Amino acid sequence: ASEDFGAVTKILIQKISKFNLNQKIKIRLITNGSYISNPNIQKALTSIKKFDSEVWFKIDQVRSKEVKAINQINISITSLKKNLEASLSKCPTIIQTCLFRINKKLPEQAALDAYINFLKPYEKKIKGIHLYSLARPSEQPSKDRLTRLTQSEIEDIAVKIQALNIPINIYS
């Protein structure tokens, strides 16, 4: 997280106000959420809330083993919940999820069930879910094991996630 996030947000708000762009520009924070519960980040999010703003909160997996393998971070389910709740408390939040094959295998049903169960308590607060697959070759150490899903495979997964009653957009 940038220590300058609050200052940058303040400048952004000043410029939007100065040029009367309040109804013309959407402020969008795209984040993995790892620092979103930080008081300085929370204060900055509060300041942009009055503008047309939203957070795109990246959640590819919710089980610790998969999160570590895919995103190379150690995060507990408790921390992930805390960070999502911090985002939801400040701005409309869209979940952004990348889906792909690992070792030529589709995402496991158990992983999808964990994802759905994780988001279920927040379904009335989450503005939407964006599903997509790899757009270009991965730069991660496991890149040789990752492959893109087809449009129909993403659509099949979206049908399962629709149990959440959250609007879903598919990008492929």
Predicted regions and their residues:
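Conserved AdoMet/S-adenosylmethionine-binding subsite of the radical SAM
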Residues: 2-145
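Acidic carboxylate-rich catalytic motifs and surrounding loops in phosphoryl-/glycosyl-chemistry enzymes
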Residues: 133, 167-172
